[in-house]
């Protein structure tokens, strides 16, 4: 066993002494040592209950004959970090999470690991660490938050973000917004829609690194505690059978993950996270693969922000197994892919009797919400390296549009213009120098997109950025424009009043300026350089790759 590096042999007597100082007995040290990575904290609503999940995991490990040893991981709440300097640190935290777990699990060689994340960067960060370490592992997340219940109906965090714009527009009073604020997020869990956290938790289940039910079982249920106990027991089986993460994460898992991503209408952040995760297993997931799969995968779900359903509805409708079973009907699921159950995807679906229980929440493949997947990859003169849009959340009027560029070099400047009423129908807001390198940190633009929606401009205004978007964003929000402005990309050459053509069905994003004029602008171009006071962000800006390759650190 791997843990023998610190428990066995004459020369490891000092190590055993330190382990006994933890209160561990000889009998406990003779059993497999299982690291339990717990991202609990009292800051993030999706993580405040993770100690309960960890206790259940440890009970499962002990029941199966192991000795659990818990250690912490950080987690950022993107909602709390939104629209201020803190958002620059959210995406960098993904690599920091992966690196710190690698440090802990190598310095203290556990035989197996159970990972307990929940929110946006903690899930991909832990998946990256899992594949990097490649010891028998299982992930069990904290689960989704329930939707809020208000006098106006169901609500979630995005309802509140958009409420700010509605107040500004005069459609809602501040008193009504205050009521919404207190009711939209009723308790623990990852925010209730198909936002980034739930997208990644659902895809961890799809990939096979988490047990069935991981993506959709609500945080507040006893079923989530039972799932955590099963995860603790299952990791012991993985250890006994020597099934490792890289045995599970193969090209088959990549194909399944992208297909389910498109069927669910997941967050555009999956286009950053999945390539970074799969790269740890030596697999290359490109933008072209995303687009190829999107073109042939029907969009079966319209969960918030694209529609009125929430993750609890997806769970009641059959969850991820039901979505996979539906896609399996048209050959889009590789049933032979291995999972942490110790069985293949096909064996899991058969054992679960996976089927759709609500055809409004999970549409049949022959009557989908749309014939193509939730995410589209655009290319053109404005984004030669690619750009990303959640087409399932775009108003029909904005699928093909020629718009007038309104150019801003920061999110704050754009928000001021939107809230000040200076953005009109037919405008395309261009926010640049918000990419991985230029931000640095590639902030999410949820505040401006929510303001656009709240002010009733969602079917009339586009937002184009080298930054990224929250999974809660809806509308013609085109992000990850590559190359970014800080690297000399064409988005840095756009001027106020330029015309931009958006053609999502044709996968095109073009700046309608002739080549001679662009050449003149390029010759005079000097990228904006920001003063970066944070050592971490300075390192990040030097090391981060393009958004087109997952914003990975080199």
From Swiss-Prot:
It catalyses: (2R)-2,3-dihydroxy-3-methylbutanoate = 3-methyl-2-oxobutanoate + H2O; (2R,3R)-2,3-dihydroxy-3-methylpentanoate = (S)-3-methyl-2-oxopentanoate + H2O. Pathway: Amino-acid biosynthesis; L-isoleucine biosynthesis; L-isoleucine from 2-oxobutanoate: step 3/4; Amino-acid biosynthesis; L-valine biosynthesis; L-valine from pyruvate: step 3/4. Its EC number is 4.2.1.9. Keywords: 2Fe-2S, Amino-acid biosynthesis, Branched-chain amino acid biosynthesis, Iron, Iron-sulfur, Lyase, Magnesium, Metal-binding. Mg(2+) binds at residues 78, 120-121, 444. It holds the Pfam family ILVD_EDD_N. Binds 1 [2Fe-2S] cluster per subunit. This cluster acts as a Lewis acid cofactor. The keyword Zinc does not apply. The active site is at 470 (proton acceptor). Its cofactor is [2Fe-2S] cluster; Mg(2+). Functions in the biosynthesis of branched-chain amino acids. Catalyzes the dehydration of (2R,3R)-2,3-dihydroxy-3-methylpentanoate (2,3-dihydroxy-3-methylvalerate) into 2-oxo-3-methylpentanoate (2-oxo-3-methylvalerate) and of (2R)-2,3-dihydroxy-3-methylbutanoate (2,3-dihydroxyisovalerate) into 2-oxo-3-methylbutanoate (2-oxoisovalerate), the penultimate precursor to L-isoleucine and L-valine, respectively. PANTHER family: D-XYLONATE DEHYDRATASE, D-XYLONATE DEHYDRATASE YAGF-RELATED. This is Dihydroxy-acid dehydratase. The gene is ilvD.
């Amino acid at each position: 066993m791997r843990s023998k590096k610190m428990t066995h042999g004459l020369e490891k007597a000092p190590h055993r002494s330190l382990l006994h100082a933890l209160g561990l007995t000889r009998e406990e040290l003779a059993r497999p040592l299982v690291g339990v990575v717990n991202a609990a904290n009292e800051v993030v609503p999706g993580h405040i209950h993770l100690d309960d999940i960890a206790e259940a995991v440890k009970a499962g490990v002990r029941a199966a004959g192991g000795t659990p040893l818990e250690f912490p991981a950080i987690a950022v709440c993107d909602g709390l970090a939104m629209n201020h300097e803190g958002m620059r640190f959210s995406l960098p935290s993904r690599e920091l999470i992966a690196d710190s777990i690698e440090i802990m699990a190598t310095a203290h060689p556990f035989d197996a690991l159970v990972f307990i994340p929940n929110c946006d960067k903690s899930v991909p960060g832990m998946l990256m660490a899992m594949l990097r370490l490649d010891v028998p592992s299982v992930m069990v997340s904290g689960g989704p938050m329930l939707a809020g219940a208000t006098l106006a109906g169901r609500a979630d965090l995005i309802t509140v973000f958009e409420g700010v714009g509605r107040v500004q527009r005069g459609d809602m009073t501040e008193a009504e917004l205050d009521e919404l604020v207190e009711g939209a997020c009723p308790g623990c869990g990852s925010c209730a829609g198909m936002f980034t956290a739930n997208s990644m938790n659902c895809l961890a289940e799809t990939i096979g690194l988490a047990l069935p039910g991981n993506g959709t079982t609500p945080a507040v249920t006893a079923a989530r505690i039972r799932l955590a106990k099963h995860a603790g027991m299952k990791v012991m089986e993985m250890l006994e059978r020597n099934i490792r993460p890289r045995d599970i994460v193969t090209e088959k898992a990549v194909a399944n993950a992208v297909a389910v991503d498109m069927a669910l209408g997941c967050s555009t952040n999956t286009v950053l996270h999945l390539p970074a995760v799969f790269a740890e297993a030596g697999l290359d997931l490109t933008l072209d693969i995303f687009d190829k799969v999107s073109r042939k995968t029907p969009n079966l779900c319209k969960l918030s922000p694209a529609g009125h359903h929430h993750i609890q509805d997806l769970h009641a409708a059959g969850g991820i197994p039901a979505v996979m079973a539906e896609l399996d009907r048209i050959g889009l699921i590789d049933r032979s892919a291995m999972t942490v159950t110790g069985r293949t995807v096909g064996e899991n679906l058969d054992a679960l009797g996976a089927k759709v229980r609500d055809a409004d929440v999970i549409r049949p493949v022959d009557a989908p919400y749309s014939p193509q997947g939730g995410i589209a990859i655009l290319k053109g003169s404005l984004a030669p390296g690619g750009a990303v849009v959640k087409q399932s959340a775009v108003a029909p009027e904005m699928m093909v549009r020629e718009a007038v560029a309104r150019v801003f070099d920061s999110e704050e400047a754009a928000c001021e213009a939107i809230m000040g009423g200076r953005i009109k129908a037919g405008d395309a807001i261009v926010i640049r120098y918000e990419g991985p390198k230029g931000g640095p940190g590639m902030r999410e633009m949820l505040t401006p997109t929510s303001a656009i929606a709240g002010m009733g401009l969602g079917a009339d205004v586009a937002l184009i950025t080298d930054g990224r978007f929250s999974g809660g964003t809806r509308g013609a929000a085109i992000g990850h424009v590559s190359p970014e402005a800080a690297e000399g990309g064409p988005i840095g050459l756009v001027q106020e009043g330029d015309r931009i053509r958006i053609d999502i069905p044709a996968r095109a994003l073009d700046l309608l300026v002739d080549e001679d004029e662009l050449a003149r602008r390029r010759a005079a171009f000097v990228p904006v350089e920001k003063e970066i006071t944070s050592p971490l962000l300075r390192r990040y800006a030097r090391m981060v790759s393009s958004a087109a390759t997952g914003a990975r650190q080199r």
